[in-house]
């Protein structure tokens, strides 16, 4: 079969002379023989004789080549048939042998598969077989003992491995729970984590229980490390930044004071896990502080408070400004408190945020108010952090300007005298924080010789619904008979009124 060749080549019609037409044969003859003038009868006879001799030689060669009797295909076919016949004979002999052997037990079933030749020459059931018992293996007790010893050895090694692992795990658990106990002893709030993906105890390092409503509740997990120590992992990543206050003057060209205090623990814990918890708590507090300051600053744009480039800028007037930023913690933060103006300012901001948390906690404990319409007040207003400080600073500057103006007027008017007093807080607000949260109010008493006196109330500058200067004029030296009551929104208006009242109170000069 391998000698049979099949080609897919296209037959060239020009090579087959039997299919050529006269118009195709004549040009070929002219190309081969040139002109017919040179063709003679003798040359044609000689050429025909040569062609006959060549064809005779080719026929002899073809007869010699076709002499073999059989092709390789026929040889392989005959060999295959011989193998098939041999296999058939062997299978027939095997079937007769098995049938004759079974005939001693089941004659009817065996005779159906026996060949006719076997049934004729050999009677059914003449071949039988007996079972040969297998030789019994001698019972060697040493083999069983060896297997038992090997099994006991493997069990001993596995038990030793398990005991060692349990001992290591017990030591790690002891270390872990000792660390958890030391953290719980410091007053940290621990709770069970009900999450299949997380194994460990939860810890609250945020200020949700203190009244904070910040987006990050401050929840972490105390996990056991590979060595058994306690690892603290916050649920949400907290950036290690802090609030820095810079006080500038001369339109921001000169820096007067910069806060540099970040670490608020007088004695930082020696436990690294507890130190990480405190550090994350401080960072979360600073993050919430700057968030609330920026949120509150958007409502104070009319008071020259701007939020730009990640900083809150408060213009205090007269070239002074306060810049509040949220910056990265330095590699070596300052641990000592320096009583600079910027440090006191940022300390007041932190105290005001803590006080706002306390107020929110008290509000959550009170019964809720009746349901209101959708047009009611904002249910989550900004916390009062920047406004109390800004109110006291602006009020103090306003009172100082009023004092300077009245002092200049008193030098030109002999009968003019004044006294400025600041209202003291009540007993409930006697602390520094209470005085800071209370709205600043100052009283200005002006005496115009013996003809009259005036009482000027200077409220908080942030209260836009009130006049900047509430003036009440009295007759004589007492404050019983009110002659006039008015209000001014600018210090210039108050100066003009005081000058006018002082001129009227002075005795007229005789000609």
Curated annotation (Swiss-Prot):
Compartments in which it is found: Nucleus
PANTHER family, A to Z: MEDIATOR OF RNA POLYMERASE II TRANSCRIPTION SUBUNIT 17
A GO cellular component entry from the record: mediator complex
GO MF entry, a single one: transcription coregulator activity
Protein's UniProt name: Mediator of RNA polymerase II transcription subunit 17
Gene Ontology process terms (BP): regulation of transcription by RNA polymerase II
Record bears the keyword Glycoprotein: no
Function statement: Component of the Mediator complex, a coactivator involved in the regulated transcription of nearly all RNA polymerase II-dependent genes. Mediator functions as a bridge to convey information from gene-specific regulatory proteins to the basal RNA polymerase II transcription machinery. Mediator is recruited to promoters by direct interactions with regulatory proteins and serves as a scaffold for the assembly of a functional preinitiation complex with RNA polymerase II and the general transcription factors.
Family statement: Belongs to the Mediator complex subunit 17 family.
Pfam families on file: Med17 (PF10156)
Subunit structure: Component of the Mediator complex.
Lineage: Eukaryota, Fungi, Dikarya, Ascomycota, Saccharomycotina
Keywords of this entry: Activator, Nucleus, Transcription, Transcription regulation
Organism, as annotated: Yarrowia lipolytica (strain CLIB 122 / E 150)
